[in-house]
Amino acid sequence: MEKAAGLAATAFQKLYQDPVAAFPRHQTLGRTLADVARRHGQPETRIEALLPRLGLAPALLTRRPGAVSGGELQRLALLRLLLVRPKVIFADEPTSRLDPITQKQVIDLLCETATAEGCAIMLVSHDPALVARTADHVLSLGPDAANADVTAPRVVGALQ
């Protein structure tokens, strides 16, 4: 990918709606994360540093993607993209396959981590409550709406 506006291709990272798509099934999570770190010139120690921030146990790295919970896998997917130090995270329905408690944990973690790492989040969501709780600015798309750069409460009120 070419540099756009002076940013490296790794400046933009996607947090998958289905975290299973972020990991090869045949490889341990630790090996996948180590490969990502190496490919992007990051020390593998960054993996260990991010694990506790994301509430993850190091033992998870010895497992394959199918052997961890959905919430754990989504947090590991977040760790995966944070390894490359993105400037923008494109989060496409990042909580859609999670139970309500895990949804809140993952979105809170995403927002806290993005703030700590100094990156922006582009959140795609069909959940007005989630948008109201997390967004500073909203672009609402639909048959009756194409509102750009308006505050979240105004758009959420119009959507309900």
Set out the residue ranges of the language-model regions.
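ABC ATPase NBD coupling module
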Residues: M1-Q13, Q27, R39
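Q-loop/switch helix immediately C-terminal to the Walker
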Residues: D18, R25-G41
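Conserved ABC ATPase "signature" region
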Residues: E44-A59
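Conserved ABC ATPase signature
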Residues: R64-V68, E72
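Hydrophobic anchor residue at the start of the ABC signature
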Residues: L78, F90
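Helical segment within the ABC ATPase nucleotide-binding domain
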Residues: K104-E117
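H-loop/switch region of ABC-family ATPase nucleotide-binding domains
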Residues: S125-H126
